[in-house]
A protein has these predicted regions:
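Extracellular/periplasmic carbohydrate-active domains that bind, remodel
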Residues: 1-238
Length: 238
């Protein structure tokens, strides 16, 4: 069975870097790990002439084709995350927004101060985590729509979609289904000014977790507590 993890990750990263949609034609895409739809918080010093001068400050937008008989499916392979651990949620698709580390400044050839930013590794040593605080209130604009997530058997530690975001973002026309045991279907509906539309979750220990902030998943500190204010959900089926 073809493993699409690396190809999807490359496409998501490319789309974010160049402000493009990552488009999924109809089909089944099998993955053997988490698709990391990660972004970095924009900071004022990185704007020039009304444009972002750092490509990494755009956000991922994942959209599935609506032209086929069924939606495209991201399918987690059997036995990818077999061990259940309530303190370590392993998602099929994971949206995160990080505060860039502040110790990467340098002076360019024109004498101007610039910044080098980096994304954190998948797992961080405890001494490194504070440099990559997760910032949900400034997680603005990502989308995940028209794509189903299927979690195959022997994945008791697997969760579906993590989407803790702020305004102008959204999830729509998505079904998350567990074919065996599993953990959380959907965590973190976006806050006010966004929407979660036509979402179906089948199976799992927890269908919907509205914890949008103060989530230590993966060991990253997160600003704020509880959920983003005034989330809008319609067409929700659990």
């Amino acid at each position: 069975e073809l493993d699409s993890t690396a190809a999807i990750q490359q496409a998501v990263d490319f789309g974010r870097t160049y402000a493009m949609v990552t488009f999924f034609p109809e089909g089944i895409y099998t993955v053997s790990g988490t698709i990391k739809a990660w972004s970095l918080t924009r900071v004022g010093g990185e704007w020039e002439n009304g444009k972002i001068n750092r490509e990494d400050f755009y956000v991922p937008v994942l959209v599935g084709s609506a032209a086929g008989a069924s939606r495209p499916v991201i399918r987690l392979a059997p036995g990818t995350f077999p061990d259940y651990d309530p303190g370590d949620r392993r998602f099929v698709v994971e949206f995160r927004n990080f505060n860039p580390p502040s110790n990467r400044s340098f002076t360019d050839e024109n004498g101007a101060t610039r910044f080098r930013y980096e994304f954190p590794p998948v797992r961080l040593a405890s001494t490194e985590r504070e440099r990559f605080g997760e910032n949900t209130p400034d997680h603005i604009g990502p989308e995940f729509r028209g794509i189903d997530i299927e979690i195959a058997e022997n994945n008791a530690g697997a969760s579906g979609l993590r989407f803790p975001t702020a305004e102008t973002s959204g999830v729509g026309d998505v079904e998350i289904r567990f074919l065996g045991d599993g953990h959380v279907g959907f965590q973190g509906p976006p806050g006010g000014g966004s929407a979660t539309l036509n979402l179906t979750i089948i199976g799992g220990r927890i269908g919907l977790d509205t914890t949008n902030q103060n989530d230590q998943t993966g060991g990253f500190p997160n600003q704020g507590t509880g959920a983003q204010p005034t989330p809008v959900l319609t067409g929700l089926t659990l």
